[in-house]
Curated annotation (Swiss-Prot):
CDD domains hit by this protein: ABC_Carb_Solutes_like (cd03259)
PANTHER family found in the cross-reference section: SPERMIDINE/PUTRESCINE IMPORT ATP-BINDING PROTEIN POTA, SPERMIDINE_PUTRESCINE IMPORT ATP-BINDING PROTEIN POTA
Metal-binding listed as a keyword: no
Classification of source organism: Bacteria, Bacillati, Actinomycetota, Actinomycetes, Mycobacteriales
Protein name: Fe(3+) ions import ATP-binding protein FbpC 2
Amino acid sequence: MTYALEVDGVDKSFGGATILRGVAFAVEPGSTTAIVGPSGCGKTTLLRLVAGFEKPDAGTIALAGRVVAGSGWAPAHRRSVGYVAQDGALFPHATVGANVGFGLPRRARTPARIAELLEMVSLDPSYAARRPDQLSGGQQQRVALARALAREPELMLLDEPFSALDAGLRANTRRIVADVLAKAAITTILVTHDQPEALSFADRVAVMSAGRLAQIGTPREIYSTPVDVPTAEFIGDAVVLSARVEGSRARCALGDVTVASNGVHGNARVMLRPEQIEVTTDGAGVSGTVVDVEYLGSEMLLGIRLDTGDGEVPERVTVRRFGATALTPGDRVGIRVLGKAVAYDL
């Protein structure tokens, strides 16, 4: 297979500080990949290397089988790549139509083509006469996408394009952008620090940490079977407990739990997602006491101090509970584990 993008052994430093170390991954044509990680982990630098805004210190980058960095070099304007920045980077004193037309060859800058591009991103062609400051943040990002689409790129790079939008607008804009790119069958890479955004937007997710790729997989794989505890805790709420693993079972503060088979034995740590822990009021399962409650509307986050019954310092877990039944600090509850835990060597 010829990949839409291949990154192999890429390093990058600035001023003596190492930003990327041995980054390697491949992206299939027509797919959507999200690169997610905390601020400063190197994800935007990686995107800029792919775009051609920076040169790697080592390693190679190939687009559709053609080396564009490494043994050869192609500048940004000679790569079939679209780029949408966090702030959209629209020209503030130009009209929407002029902004979109900037991505077109001069002879193709016709009202009909600009109208077509605006309609692709669910904007009425009449918006062409407006200025960017007359649009909402979500509309501005869609104009930026239309400008990037004008070049008919083989690869679209999205650098945290939704982060400046409020929650409701962000979700709606994300859905529109995802739909546009899927219909156009354009290979897409999204960089974000928002874990739910990465999981919902992409076919595959790459988790970055300290300049390296910690794990690449489907959203379900990344969430359900993270490669290590730091990845588990970064990608979502996690309950991590000390345990003793024997075969497919582990003994921990929540009792005997089933673990996914991954070769871990003996003293270890096990990870569960909060939704795997069922809180009951009938006394079934391991018992504990509610010590704090965080109300989140349709759900509650409960801090529960577990009863160990053996004189040890009680272990505390945070679990998610749905439904209208109110619990308050001091309430006695039972806990049952649903599904399999993931075990990690110490």
